A protein has these predicted regions:
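A recognition module on extended beta-rich or small alphabeta surfaces enriched in W/G with H and D/E
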Residues: 114-200
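N-terminal low-complexity, intrinsically disordered segments
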Residues: 2-83
Length: 218
């Protein structure tokens, strides 16, 4: 166990859930891919990623250096590994900012792995985000979205729509996705504070039911 890094964003206290918690170990498959990302970036840039949010621009820079980044089908296995590595690292950075857990369903692919916040209902697939950043286009079926319950999802979407438009070159970056995530978590925390309630842990079953319904046609 290692100590959780304090994020420094006062607005997200409700999503953090109180005092700093011990950071649980990541699932082995996530930890291995994130470590592989650290090694790959070190080889390319000579810099050691440290799982700090300030390292995310370095991750974006690393992707710009990859040869043949566009969409040649023959590079699918290579792109898949890069997406899995960088997504795992991105998820681990987020997990050091906010209490969250990885959910890995048996037989699922890396793009299906979810990071689920513990004290506010917010979940996403870091590897799906990585695919969008890597290919610079939206993932099918909204796989890289930040998943929220209704009516919160619509309310957050309205607030995001009121923000200044982001240039396309910035939109498909990990740095921009992290900024949007922090804003979203801050708004969720604001709602909890205004309600006067203390943050309560969200059970895994609530997320599981949400995604079951999402996958059910009709």
């Amino acid at each position: 166990m290692t100590g959780r890094r304090k994020g420094g964003e006062a607005a997200v206290e409700a999503c953090v859930g109180g005092p700093a918690e011990a950071l649980e170990e990541a699932p082995p498959e996530v930890a291995d891919l994130a470590a592989a990302c650290v090694r790959a970036v070190h080889r390319a840039l000579g810099v050691e990623l440290d799982y700090d949010p300030d390292s995310i621009p370095l991750l974006d820079h690393y992707l710009t250096l990859l040869p043949n980044r566009p969409r040649e089908p023959t590079r699918e296995p290579v792109r898949g590994l890069v997406a899995a590595m960088t997504g795992a690292y991105f998820g681990e950075v987020v997990r050091r900012l906010f209490p969250a857990r990885w959910t890995i369903e048996p037989g699922g692919e890396a793009v299906d792995w979810r990071l689920e916040f513990r004290y506010c209902f917010l979940a996403f697939s870091p590897v799906a985000v990585a695919w969008e950043v890597l290919l610079r286009c939206d993932a099918p079926d909204g796989a890289a979205a930040y998943f929220l319950e209704e009516p919160t999802r619509g309310q957050v979407a309205e607030r995001l729509d009121r923000l200044p438009r982001v240039p396309i070159d910035d939109y498909y970056t990990f740095a921009q996705r992290l900024e949007t995530l922090v804003l979203t978590a801050g708004w969720l925390a604001e709602r909890v504070r205004q309600s006067g309630r203390s943050p309560r842990p969200i059970e895994p079953e609530r997320y599981a039911e949400f995604f079951r319904r999402l996958r059910t046609p009709g």
